[in-house]
Amino acid sequence: MNCKFCSFGDKWNIIKEKHILTDEEILARVRIQVENGAHYIVLRTTEFFSIPDLISLVQKIKKNIPGTYRIVLNIGEFDLDTANTLYEKGVWGIYHTIRLREGKDTFFDVKVRQKTQTAVMNSPLHLITLVEPVGIEHSNEEIANSFLINVQKNTLINGAMARVPVLGTPLGDKEAITSERLAQIIAVLRLSGGNIVQDICVHPATLSAIKSGANVMVVETGAVPRDAKYTPEDWAKITIQSAHQLLQSANYETRHRF
């Protein structure tokens, strides 16, 4: 959809090769994360990925990998009937946010994305959002407004994701925010979330951001919109082991120690 910060845009001609993970490859990766204490398993797809195929994959994961983990999807637009079906088939939550400068730095219709959020909120699914992708171009007011709108939607998981410059995209020459700025934003979001926001997520995670109030971080692999290349290993060398270590360094207790 040619978002100005995303490596996936056809217009930018950055991604040259097609990669499709088999169900077996996905199951193997999920199993590693679950066995090492991952609480959420997020399946991120391209905008128009087949929902029936995704449901089939979710059911395979639930059948073959035991555990108390929760499955979250980051997918395209859908209606209430689909939301209810996803829940019935084992999905716990949906990541679907209105990004900063949606419709300007992206080519998505804000109203369409809001409609999908409403479908999630009217179903048993849990809505997950982040203030993202935060860059030096965004004002305090934009960031605060995005977060407060998310809070009004009773999102259990909120937080912030920094924009990672990808050369070749329109925003690729704009520097990223500093780790200090990201930590500051996380601290403000934690204090402002009150008793509504259960978890504060930060991505990419830093120790300062974790110490500032984030308690959820992301380990990702595969097609990453913040990278010009396919990522067969954990992106930016953030592994499930290093995630545990980072959280433990900030005095959080996790299921495993490394």
Where are these regions (language model features)?
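Generic structural signal for helix capping and beta-alpha/helix-loop junctions
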Residues: S50, G103, E137, L167, ...
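A general structural detector for well-ordered alpha-helical segments in enzyme core domains, enriched
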Residues: I26-R29, L54-I61, T82, V112-A119, ...
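Auxiliary Fe-S-binding modules of radical SAM enzymes
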Residues: V151-F258
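Local cysteine-cluster metal-coordination motifs and their immediate loop/turn environment
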Residues: M1-K11
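Catalytic cores of alpha/beta
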Residues: D79-E88, G135-V151, H203-G213
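Core AdoMet radical
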Residues: D10-E25, Q33-D53, L57-V58, K62-V120, ...
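Conserved C-terminal portion of the radical SAM core fold
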Residues: L43, G93, F108-L171, I186-I200
